[in-house]
């Protein structure tokens, strides 16, 4: 999943850059959305991992 989130962020960065260079605001905004979505998913995934680590410590 982490790779997918990084890919989504990179894809968003490319879209945003191309949209900016070509003055295509729709593509630029789509890129911003992809980047934000990828970052949010990555944050949630990291939070889940940390929560599971804490839970595992209490199980021992």
UniProtKB/Swiss-Prot annotation:
Residue ranges of the region described as Disordered: 1-41
Matches recorded under InterPro entries: CsbD, UPF0337_stress_rsp, YjbJ_sf
Matching Pfam families: CsbD
SUPFAM superfamilies: Hypothetical protein YjbJ
Protein name: UPF0337 protein SSP1134
Compositionally biased intervals (Basic and acidic residues): 23-41
Family: Belongs to the UPF0337 (CsbD) family.
Classification via Gene3D superfamilies: YjbJ
């Amino acid at each position: 999943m982490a790779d997918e989130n990084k890919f989504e962020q990179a894809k968003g960065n490319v879209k945003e850059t191309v949209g900016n260079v070509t003055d295509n605001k729709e593509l630029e905004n789509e890129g911003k959305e992809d980047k934000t979505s990828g970052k949010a998913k990555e944050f949630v995934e990291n939070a889940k991992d940390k929560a599971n680590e804490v839970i595992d410590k209490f199980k021992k």
